[in-house]
Amino acid sequence: MSTLPKTLTLDTSTSRANPTPQPMKRLTVPRIRQRKGGEPIVMLTAYTVRMAQLLDPHCDMLLVGDSLAQVIYGLPHTVGVTMEMMALHGAAVVRGSYHAAVIVDMPFGSYEGSPQQAFDNAARLLKETGAAAVKVEGGKVLAPTIEFLTQRGIPVMGHVGLTPQAVNILGGYGVRGKSEEEARSIVEDAVAVAQAGAFSIVIEGVLESIAIEITNKVACPTIGIGASAQCDGQVLVTDDMLGMFERVPKFVKRYRDMAGVVSGAVQDYADEVRSRSFPTEDQIYAG
């Protein structure tokens, strides 16, 4: 039986949570909506308690993205993600955070069939994770589903432009909106999603002019990823911006080389184990 995660204050100096319950002061969906045109919104992906603890003080939103398919599970794309995966990782991120609004991706196949299917699965995710909202990919075709959800109390973040769950139809992860017809369609998608009640919209992998036009046209905040600095906020896959992978998309800035840091630390450990210089008396219980 699933239960909502307990409210905890987290000690970020360790990997363990302080068991003393404290009042939460999370950013809410209405407060995110109010950020339209204001200070840019900071969003990153998180999949685990510890990463949520580290990101939370600096972020307005944490996205439990279906990008965990590649980052955590080594899958080739996001199509293979399940509801169980999203529920487990979503609950972990909620437990590991206290400030940021947590958004959970709805996996491929969990919402496209009908508005009722989408509601049932979205309600399950919110119940099992304690997250603030769900995110869905799609435009005009999905607008009735978004309206159905929002009218029934489920906050929805939209996602237009390059939609990774549609990789099999799109044929890859190339930039969208290069033709006038496709550019117009993406703008129409975003407007339809906003009018359906989405509280914010991710714009991914489009020409900058398209992202700016959408940001100027819709009343809700836009979150760019490979879009434009003029969006109302930005999101990246955390492991990409930390430099955990050798190959990253053009729109990623590597703020650290964490792959090098981890590799170096493991090499030092391995060398010390093989030379019997670890553990030392500092790490041994004498007796």
Swiss-Prot record:
Catalyzed reactions: 3-methyl-2-oxobutanoate + (6R)-5,10-methylene-5,6,7,8-tetrahydrofolate + H2O = 2-dehydropantoate + (6S)-5,6,7,8-tetrahydrofolate
Principal place of residence: cytoplasm
Cofactor comment: Binds 1 Mg(2+) ion per subunit.
GO terms assigned for molecular function: 3-methyl-2-oxobutanoate hydroxymethyltransferase activity; magnesium ion binding
Protein's UniProt keywords contain Metal-binding: yes
Cofactors that this protein relies on: Mg(2+)
Gene3D superfamilies attached to this UniProt entry: Phosphoenolpyruvate-binding domains
Involved pathway(s): Cofactor biosynthesis; (R)-pantothenate biosynthesis; (R)-pantoate from 3-methyl-2-oxobutanoate: step 1/2
Binding, 3-methyl-2-oxobutanoate: 66-67, 105, 135
GO biological process: pantothenate biosynthetic process
Stored Pfam families: Pantoate_transf
Binding site for Mg(2+): 66, 105, 137
Region Disordered, annotated ranges: 1-24
Active site: 204
CDD domains per UniProt: KPHMT-like
Enzyme Commission number: 2.1.2.11
Domain of life where this protein originates: Bacteria
Keywords: Cytoplasm, Magnesium, Metal-binding, Pantothenate biosynthesis, Transferase
Sequence ranges of Polar residues compositional bias: 1-19
Location(s) in or outside the cell: Cytoplasm
Thylakoid keyword on record: no
Family assignment from sequence similarity: Belongs to the PanB family.
Assembly notes: Homodecamer; pentamer of dimers.
Family annotation (HAMAP family): PanB
Protein name per the record: 3-methyl-2-oxobutanoate hydroxymethyltransferase
Source species of the chain: Sphingopyxis alaskensis (strain DSM 13593 / LMG 18877 / RB2256) (Sphingomonas alaskensis)
Gene: panB
